[in-house]
A protein has these predicted regions:
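Bacterial Sec-dependent N-terminal signal peptides
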Residues: 1-8
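Exported/periplasmic ABC-transporter solute-binding proteins
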Residues: 4, 21-77, 81-110, 116-309
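A composition-driven surface/loop motif
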Residues: 11-13
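C-terminal motif of bacterial Sec signal peptides marking the signal peptidase cleavage site
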Residues: 15-19
Length: 309
């Protein structure tokens, strides 16, 4: 009797241990399966802000809304203000992402040079800038020399560059604008002038509206803001298209940077990874008029030097 009881007890103990072992292994497999098949959004939460480049803003706006739809516990606030403002704010820690059309080293110099060293660059796209005019100026192409003369005030009438007998109205951007820096560096090769009768406006949407509604107006915009209310001007006979930018034929372009102060983690890292995902790069980037960095056949360094890949 005692022997039978001992056998039954031992058998029950063995079954119990086996069951425990089976449950442990099953849980591990389930957890591994969940981490590989469940969406990454399951554990993502947090809130952060991005500010800066208005040229990049349409892409960040659209991507952030899609990301928040996928991750209900994440809140992202996106503002403009210009590249200079975005870089200053992320360096100061008032926002978590500083959007910029220029390298941080270009804007944060001299006394702020150490701040630039703390920032981590995430290049999410390429933006191209085109000179744009009111549709009735009678010109569809300008040379580099003509653009320089217009934006430095040497030429003030469209007839002097082959257009109508009409006063040229400049719509420029503030000095802090990354769009202005890109246009000056790669279209003009010189600084534009803040002339007394010119208009200065940082918001790209407002620039487009002003150019479309002001007779004789000229300005410049990222391709993502082009529409049929304005005219995009050819540069030295070359159109600002994604193909011409990618090949290096059209020179007025820059990387779109999303800077963080140090390496990102948590929801911030997840969002930046999402910006570089096929979902955003393969659809939103192209649909909004940007060029994926991977499509570029040339590269450009912080000094502006272009080399073939």
């Amino acid at each position: 009797m005692k022997k039978s009881l001992l056998v039954l007890t031992t058998l029950a103990l063995g079954i119990s241990l086996a069951a425990c072992g089976k449950n442990d292994n099953s849980n591990n497999a389930s957890n591994n399966g969940a981490s590989s098949s469940a969406p990454a959004s399951a554990a993502i939460s947090g809130a952060f802000s991005a500010a800066g480049s208005t040229a990049l803003q349409p892409l960040v706006d659209q991507a952030s809304k899609k990301f928040m739809d996928l991750n209900k516990d994440v809140t992202i606030t996106v503002n403009g203000g210009g590249s200079g403002a975005g870089l200053s704010q992320v360096a100061e820690g008032t926002v978590q992402i500083g959007n910029s059309d220029v390298f941080a080293e270009e804007k944060l110099k001299d006394a702020d040079a150490d701040k630039a060293k703390e920032l981590v660059d995430h290049q999410v796209a390429v933006v191209s800038i085109a000179a744009v005019s009111n549709k009735d100026v009678g010109v569809d192409n300008l040379t580099k020399a003509q653009l320089v003369d217009i934006f430095t005030g040497k030429v003030t009438n469209w007839k002097d560059v082959g257009g109508k007998d009409q006063k040229i109205v400049l719509v420029n951007r503030p000095a802090s604008s990354g769009t202005r820096a890109t246009f000056e560096n790669f279209a003009l090769g010189a600084k534009s002038e803040d002339l007394p009768d010119s208009i200065t406006e940082d918001a790209s949407g407002t620039v487009r509206k002003l150019v479309s509604e002001t007779p004789g107006a000229i300005g410049y915009l990222a391709l993502s803001y082009l529409d049929d209310t304005i005219q995009a001007l050819k540069y030295e006979g070359v159109e600002a298209t994604a193909e011409n930018v990618a090949s290096g034929t059209y020179p007025v372009w820059a990387y779109e940077h999303m800077y963080t102060k140090g390496e990102p983690d948590g929801a911030l890292k997840a969002f930046l990874d999402y910006m570089l995902s096929d979902e955003i790069q393969g659809t939103d980037v192209k649909d909004l008029g940007y060029i994926p960095v991977s499509d570029m056949k040339v590269t450009r360094d912080v000094e502006g030097n272009v080399t073939n890949k």
